[in-house]
């Protein structure tokens, strides 16, 4: 099946998704499984960055992820600690894996991390007890720390640290047009949340407890400029509040307090010994 035919088949199936079910066979099922396998292997990504820095979302791959839920029946999911099982429509990425497969993949998977099939984990990445949903991409050398979650179709670049308890939002529910994107060399502080298709540009540092949605005001303290939906490259961001000019309650915002410098890098650098 050529790329063009694959995309057309999935787009057509999406337009007629009410007729897609666990009984569907043939070309539609083959196309969706092919797309999921491309995502799982890293040969395709839900979003890709152009030379101009603009991110392009490949909607057909996101559609394939969603169609998979209509095609796949509930089934036992093996692989839990002490023989634990789950009941779901998406198998574990590690289903059927042995020593050879883990060595070939080249990343660390610390128990009891969970990764659904259709997510790609690059060589050198470290998964602490965390969760990575299908369609997600985790770049080379990145650590997903304890109890952090990487949502469906989210894109996390290389050499990032996604700290403990952090949530990187997905696209499935509520249904989102664009995935969250964390570019290379970013540090996301513990218990932070980045959702609703927000882009965190390269080298940025989010302090502990920063929450950013599409509607969150991002305030540059130096200029007073307010923006939405994107953290500029090499920003240091902390939680803040904007006063109500009428004297009412202050409202939460994210504040760019400075640009990343040597001192920031010293505090947030990744540890090669752990990789």
Swiss-Prot record:
Q: Which InterPro entries match?
A: DapD_Trfase_Hexpep_rpt_fam, Hexapep, THP_succinylTrfase_dom1, THP_succinylTrfase_N_sf, Trans_hexapeptide_repeat, Trimer_LpxA-like_sf
Protein localization: Cytoplasm
Instruction: Give an example GO molecular function.
Output: 2,3,4,5-tetrahydropyridine-2,6-dicarboxylate N-succinyltransferase activity
The protein's matches in SUPFAM superfamilies, at most eight in alphabetical order, are given as: Trimeric LpxA-like enzymes
Q: Which domain of life is it from?
A: Bacteria
Task: Indicate whether Ribosomal protein appears among the record's keywords.
Answer: no
Query: Which keywords fit this entry according to its UniProt record?
Result: Acyltransferase, Amino-acid biosynthesis, Cytoplasm, Diaminopimelate biosynthesis, Lysine biosynthesis, Repeat, Transferase
Pfam families per the UniProt record, alphabetical: Hexapep (PF00132), Hexapep_2 (PF14602), THDPS_N_2 (PF14805)
Under catalytic activity, the entry for this protein gives: (S)-2,3,4,5-tetrahydrodipicolinate + succinyl-CoA + H2O = (S)-2-succinylamino-6-oxoheptanedioate + CoA
Return the broad EC class. Answer: transferase
Gene Ontology cellular-component terms for this entry are: cytoplasm
**Which residues are involved in binding substrate?**
108, 145
Q: Which GO terms describe its biological process?
A: diaminopimelate biosynthetic process; lysine biosynthetic process via diaminopimelate
Annotated EC? 2.3.1.117
Q: To which pathway does this protein belong?
A: Amino-acid biosynthesis; L-lysine biosynthesis via DAP pathway; LL-2,6-diaminopimelate from (S)-tetrahydrodipicolinate (succinylase route): step 1/3
Q: Report quaternary structure and partners.
A: Homotrimer.
HAMAP family according to UniProt: DapD
Q: Which family does the record assign?
A: Belongs to the transferase hexapeptide repeat family.
Kindly provide the name given to this protein in its UniProt entry: 2,3,4,5-tetrahydropyridine-2,6-dicarboxylate N-succinyltransferase
Q: Which organism is it from?
A: Maricaulis maris (strain MCS10) (Caulobacter maris)
């Amino acid at each position: 099946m050529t790329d063009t035919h694959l995309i057309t088949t999935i787009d057509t199936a999406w337009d007629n998704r009410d007729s897609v079910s666990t009984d569907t066979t043939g070309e539609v099922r083959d196309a969706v499984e092919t797309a999921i396998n491309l995502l799982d292997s890293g040969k395709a990504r839900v979003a890709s960055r152009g030379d101009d820095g603009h991110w392009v979302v490949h909607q057909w791959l996101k559609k394939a992820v969603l169609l998979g839920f209509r095609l796949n029946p509930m089934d036992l999911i093996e692989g839990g600690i002490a023989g634990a099982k789950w009941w779901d429509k998406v198998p574990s990425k590690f289903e059927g894996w042995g020593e050879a497969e883990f060595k070939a993949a080249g990343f660390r998977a610390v128990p009891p991390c969970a990764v659904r099939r259709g997510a790609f984990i690059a060589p050198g990445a470290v998964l602490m007890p965390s969760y990575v949903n299908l369609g997600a991409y985790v770049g080379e050398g990145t650590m997903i720390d304890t109890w952090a979650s990487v949502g469906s179709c989210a894109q996390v670049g290389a050499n990032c640290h996604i700290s403990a308890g952090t949530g990187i939002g997905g696209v499935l529910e509520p249904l989102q047009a664009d995935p969250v994107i964390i570019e290379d060399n970013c540090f996301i502080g513990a218990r932070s949340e980045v959702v609703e298709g927000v882009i965190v540009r390269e080298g940025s540092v989010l302090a502990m407890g920063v929450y950013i949605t599409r509607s969150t005001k991002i305030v540059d303290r130096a200029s007073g400029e307010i923006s939405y939906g994107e953290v500029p490259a090499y920003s240091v961001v902390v939680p803040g509040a904007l006063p109500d000019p009428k004297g009412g309650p202050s409202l939460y915002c994210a504040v760019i307090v400075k640009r990343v410098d040597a001192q920031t890098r010293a505090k947030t650098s990744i540890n090669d010994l752990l990789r």
